[in-house]
C-alpha cells in the first residue's frame, strides 16, 4: 500500500509524489505486464532479454569507468 501525506491542501505536490512513488514501486510496469496473459515460454524469453540488456549496460558502464 502506498501512502502519501497531504500538507496544507497542496494537491499538486501530493499528486506528483504519488506518481513518483508508483514509478519507484514499478507499479505501471506490473500493470502493463498483467494486462494480457503471457505464456511461460514468452516470459522466459522476455526475462532473458532483460538480463542480457542489463549485462550490456553494466559492461558499458564498466568500460567507461576504467
Swiss-Prot record:
Record keywords: Ribonucleoprotein, Ribosomal protein
Gene Ontology cellular-component annotations: ribonucleoprotein complex; ribosome
Tagged with keyword Ribonucleoprotein: yes
Source superkingdom: Bacteria
Gene3D superfamilies: Ribosomal protein S8
Claim: Ribosomal protein is one of the keywords in the record: yes
Any one Pfam family match given in the protein's UniProt record, by short name: Ribosomal_S21
GO biological process: translation
Any one GO molecular-function label of the UniProt entry: structural constituent of ribosome
Matches recorded under InterPro entries: Ribosomal_bS21, Ribosomal_bS21_sf
Annotated family: Belongs to the bacterial ribosomal protein bS21 family.
Protein name: Small ribosomal subunit protein bS21
Organism name: Rickettsia canadensis (strain McKiel)
Gene: rpsU
